[in-house]
From Swiss-Prot:
The chain crosses the membrane at residues 7-27, 33-53, 63-83, 87-107. Keywords: Cell inner membrane, Cell membrane, Membrane, Transmembrane, Transmembrane helix. It comes from Nitrosospira multiformis (strain ATCC 25196 / NCIMB 11849 / C 71). InterPro entries: UPF0060. Signal peptide: none annotated. SUPFAM superfamilies: Multidrug resistance efflux transporter EmrE. Belongs to the UPF0060 family. GO terms for cellular component: plasma membrane. This is UPF0060 membrane protein Nmul_A0351. NCBIfam families: PRK02237.1. It is a multi-pass membrane protein. Its main location: membrane. It holds the Pfam family UPF0060. It is found in: Cell inner membrane.
Amino acid sequence: MFELKTLFLFLATALAEIVGCYLPYLWLKRDGSAWLLVPAAASLALFAWLLTLHPTDAGRTYAAYGGVYVSVAVLWLWAVDGVRPTAWDMAGSLLALTGMAIIMFGPRHA
């Protein structure tokens, strides 16, 4: 159950960060409304708050979170940008998730 909760929390954190960064991108690069900055700021605040909910030390959380972020960003590429990931994108995502699993769920010895 710990693993499932941790993975869900990482996914929610990644989505909050990606949305918080994507909305200003739409404003700056795709002529979106400046009002996009309001939900972007809320999403980034949610991202920061979600980081505080992770059940391990901050450095370990940030390191492991990076692997989930990479994978969610590749899925975003496909779902939102409409660009199908390459085999290399998928292999890199799998490698990043493997690193996350080792960091988060590997044995802890003092």
